[in-house]
């Protein structure tokens, strides 16, 4: 089972500055880390690979320094890493980010599942995952707390809702 995991390198501090001309984060001199929610997604992708075979492809859109997060993903068990980097991507909103990631996933082609972290700690929007699924025309489930079973081209997940949990089964 081939799993794509979308990851992002984020500032490792809450003390960030914004460039007033470009409205983008000034990343120089700020320690960066792998987004914690993406680390959970990566861990789940590796677990799926260990149980079902296949490979994990970590993908990130960001500046050249985002290679550090991808190297961390390889160390954590990803088999391949892809960095999508271009100055034109600087300051991209979630719609642009999900579009670029969707084009990359379409080019990869050979995947069974795409996992995204719940949200990034630098934006907190949680929009890239659903927008990515919409761009690719694939099912999407938010707030998954556990993948209960994967078999015969389907997956059963448990997701958090206000009143507790909901179990959903879907085709892959």
What do the predicted segments below correspond to?
Residues 1-172:
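N-terminal glycine-rich FAD/FM-binding segment characteristic of electron-transfer flavoproteins
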């Amino acid at each position: 089972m081939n799993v794509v995991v979308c990851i992002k390198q984020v500032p490792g501090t809450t003390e960030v500055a914004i460039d007033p001309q470009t409205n983008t984060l000034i990343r120089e001199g700020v320690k960066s880390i792998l987004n914690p929610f993406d680390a959970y997604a990566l861990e789940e992708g590796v677990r799926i690979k260990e149980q079902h075979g296949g490979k994990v492809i970590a993908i990130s859109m960001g500046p050249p320094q985002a290679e550090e997060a991808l190297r961390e993903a390889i160390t954590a068990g990803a088999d391949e890493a892809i960095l999508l980097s271009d100055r034109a991507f600087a300051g991209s909103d979630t719609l642009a980010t999900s579009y670029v990631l969707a084009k990359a996933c379409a080019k990869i082609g050979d995947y069974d599942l795409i996992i995204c972290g719940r949200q990034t700690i630098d934006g907190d929007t949680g929009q890239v995952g659903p927008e990515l699924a919409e761009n690719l025309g694939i099912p999407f489930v938010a707030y998954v707390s556990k993948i209960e079973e994967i078999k015969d081209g389907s997956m059963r997940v448990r997701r958090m809702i206000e009143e507790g949990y909901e179990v959903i089964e879907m085709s892959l």
